[in-house]
């Protein structure tokens, strides 16, 4: 009897060793794992996992920087048991990273590149502050960086989010992030990418692309950028890209449908036009509907009968097979279904050749070049890019001023407060023109919302018709015509209808009449130089405005010229002449040699009551003249008050800089000005008028008497400052106000009144006892000093 075999216990399963960081674990014999290829071949086999962004295209042209995945690194699709690391070492949070941040809101956009380390960043607030400083927006400015977004529109809310979200970010202030903002940021970051240039003009995907997308996505039940309940299905049908080629995993019904369409197409190609079966199948892909194309023909009531329509049908099918960038948003997919079905029905109708050429979208392109060279982009694709880019620039301006639902928006402008565009409210002197340049959009909107033009007399109509005749634009107007034209330009209802400035005058003509000297001031898009007339030797200030930096802000200069020409007062800077060339605009203005009041305050700190009374008197006289014409300055501050030193050693203030001035025909809701001098009704956004200038006059009077402003934030926090201003909380601190008269304090209280209806007007200030007593006393003393000299 044979011996029974000895039963040996099975060997215990080998405990898998922990994966070494530098080398992968050896593969198990007989098992084919994902790591049995060489590492050189492995890089070409890996498919990258990237969540689809809301619109980010994936064109053939390489980006200058790789747009990384949601965690800031390229993650191969390995199983969790694989010993290969899924995150590259160079994207480790511990290693310093170079990031690029784009700040939107101005032209040109601000872009900064920073080298950041995770260990050096303590808090997210510190990170935002550092980025804001690098972009040129200190933390006390109103348009500082408040939020960070990724290129996919996801908000960064913590330091850890920032260090795993990629290498490029979008910085925003209080304004919301829009799809247009993301597009502008992408064009700034990757200006040479062809896919970005084509993406805004190819939002409707081709039927071939639509057939690759999941059916649920085409129905519009899910969003493209969300990871919802269908994430497992999306992974099974994921679209993987490698070296510009697209491999797709289709559902069984979609694959059968595509194979049937390919067989029908191959059978129809030798004979000419595609077969009706193939055409109807293609229609099913294009429209994304369940019924067949034959049913579409029946419901449309039109049948393909002529050869011309067959050729157009073939042309349409050839266009539909063209690839489209994969960055089309899901909202556009939903809108494209109805539009594509309408195009198919319209293509079947028997049209004349002239009508066939007028089709829109892709039907307007020629299909022969598409079929002849499907891989190389034809010239017809490149040509619309330059034109469409120009249209896009104009469109962005029109979108700012005319959003969707234009009638309703215009009604809102008249009846209620519009959406406030945050503009910089700067208290530094070198940036005094920033607020004006940032608010060009709302200036245009408000000017467009002005009331209709007042009826003109017959004489004015004849004069206007005579000036519209050809040949009168390039000639010099007579002084009488100039005065009549200025009278017409005083009307607030015609800010953009001002007669054109003299044309055909080049820079040499300006230099022919004036000797141009050195620079005495500058702003965002203008430089002020001293000049002297060659014949009269009279000194003037020449404001030279660069038109290349003024694109989209022309109305600001036109409004400023219009208002200055309508004003004539000894306490207001006069405009002498206006010249315009192809490159620049020249404003020849009165030259005040004593500097501005800001310099005088820095030099003297504070002024005696008589001198302060004279300065406030000059300011209020100018404001009386302006307010009588319903013109509000909106930027009254020491920097805009020029000091003229007279021969009798007295001074005269002249109001200047009318870039924010505006005719008041209804309450204004635009937030603008300078923080220290801004009125509370501007901040409350409930509508304001002429009274805001008097609040600023009260702040200036307070500074003249004690040397510091009435409203201050110890931490220089602008939000805190605005809250203090809205409450109207100020006090006469001791010992600075101990020697100031009660009459002066009473005038300050009446000017710094929160209620605009109770606030003093300019005429009431001139009638105040302190002004009449102290101001006249100072004037009498100056006259007595002048009499012995004479």
UniProtKB/Swiss-Prot annotation:
Binding-site list for ATP: 520-528, 543
UniProt-annotated catalytic positions: 635 (proton acceptor)
Catalysed transformations (reactions): L-seryl-[protein] + ATP = O-phospho-L-seryl-[protein] + ADP + H(+); L-threonyl-[protein] + ATP = O-phospho-L-threonyl-[protein] + ADP + H(+)
Biological process, per Gene Ontology: intracellular signal transduction; negative regulation of protein localization to nucleus; protein localization to nucleus
EC number: 2.7.11.1
Listed Low complexity bias regions: 201-218
Family of the protein in this entry: Belongs to the protein kinase superfamily. CAMK Ser/Thr protein kinase family. CaMK subfamily.
PANTHER family: SERINE/THREONINE-PROTEIN KINASE
The protein, known as: Serine/threonine-protein kinase DCLK3
Species name: Mus musculus
